[in-house]
Regions:
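NAD(P)-binding Rossmann-fold cofactor-contacting core
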Residues: 151-169
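Short loop/helix-cap segments at secondary-structure boundaries that form the rim of catalytic
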Residues: 14-20, 34-38, 52-57, 71-78, ...
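Short acidic low-complexity segments
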Residues: 28-37, 50-54, 170-185
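Rossmann-like dinucleotide-binding domain for NAD(H)/NADP(H)
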Residues: 214, 220-311
Length: 311
């Protein structure tokens, strides 16, 4: 089996893959490989372009280094697509928790005051132990976030596509169809949704209006889940205490986009995940290693993407 690595790894991590019998590893830039070599590739580790996939005539498996797989709806059915779901939850949920506390404790506002040398008490702050935290999307990322919030005393509610037995860190577990009923109860609403037909534009002006006036909104899933113009409008109208977006629509944000300068909206450039935490890369490599072992033994893969739902 010939595997083309598109995921950048150092020499130490590369050596971990030399011990797989029957596996030939290609760490070259695809641009440096001739047509015959590309045609011999059986598997790709990384997120290939459509053009590259079409050059790999023998391709049978792609192991993405991301959890999201929505960009691969065009992939031929005979190619197995596996994702890296399970690798990103710890790092992204820490980012979410940091941003949650930054808003609740006025830390971002105090930083603005510091730049102006303004020594002033901004008054009351909020506590997680008296908050209701709702995660719309309660898989790897949302689940880790709820777990962290629960450990700090929050009342936690997880929303999944279908009704599900509640996890130990959940006080309630609800179905996606119940989101409108529970939004008015939540002090913090965290979105970690994949991009599907059902989730695009899901949080529009009507749903944002269902949230408490002083609620906090976080989005770390896909920017398309929130109608950006509606979000800017409702925040400018005085609704929502704070918003953190690690994902936006569009991405990257144009320099003149209103999200940059809207009060109480805080943006990070889609960096909560990626490989900024080395442990995340290690987890992705572990998922790939397990699936490579399965492939070499003709065993079923883990983390197979369900094409019917997009993740």
């Amino acid at each position: 089996m010939t595997i083309l690595f598109l995921t950048s790894v150092n020499d130490e991590k590369r050596h971990c893959f030399y011990d797989f019998p029957g596996a030939r590893m290609l760490f070259d830039d695809p641009k440096d490989l001739d047509a015959e070599t590309l045609a011999s590739v059986d598997a790709i580790f990384g997120n290939p372009s459509r053009d590259l996939v079409e050059k790999c005539a023998n391709l049978r498996w792609i192991q993405l280094n991301s959890a999201g797989a929505n960009k691969y709806s065009w992939l031929p059915e005979h190619i197995v697509l596996t994702n890296a779901s399970g690798a990103y939850g710890p790092a992204i949920s820490e980012h979410m928790l940091g941003c949650t506390l930054g808003i609740m404790k006025n830390l971002f506002r105090y930083h603005d005051l510091q730049k102006r040398k303004d020594w002033r008490n901004l008054g009351s702050v909020r506590m997680l132990e008296t908050s209701v935290v709702l995660s719309v999307g309660a898989g790897d990322i949302g689940g880790h976030y709820l777990h962290k919030c629960k450990s700090l005393g929050a009342y936690t509610i997880g929303i999944r596509r279908k009704a599900h037995e509640k996890a130990p860190y959940e006080d309630e577990s609800l179905a996606f169809s119940q989101v409108d009923d529970v939004l008015p109860r939540a002090d913090i609403v965290a979105l970690s949704l994949p991009e599907t037909r059902e989730t695009i534009g899901f949080f529009d002006y009507r749903r944002l209006s269902l949230m408490k006036k002083d609620a906090i909104l976080l989005n770390v899933g896909r920017g398309s889940a929130v109608v950006t113009d509606d979000l800017v409008r409702i925040v400018n109208e005085g609704h929502l205490a704070g918003v953190h977006l690690d994902v936006t629509d569009p991405e990257p944000l144009p320099e003149d986009h209103p999200l940059w300068n809207t009060e109480r909206i805080y943006v990070t450039p889609h960096i909560a995940g990626r490989f900024n935490a080395e442990v995340t890369l290690d987890r992705v490599l572990d998922i790939f290693s397990k699936n490579l072992a399965h492939a070499l033994k003709n065993e079923p893969f883990e983390n197979v993407v369900d094409r019917s739902i997009g993740y």
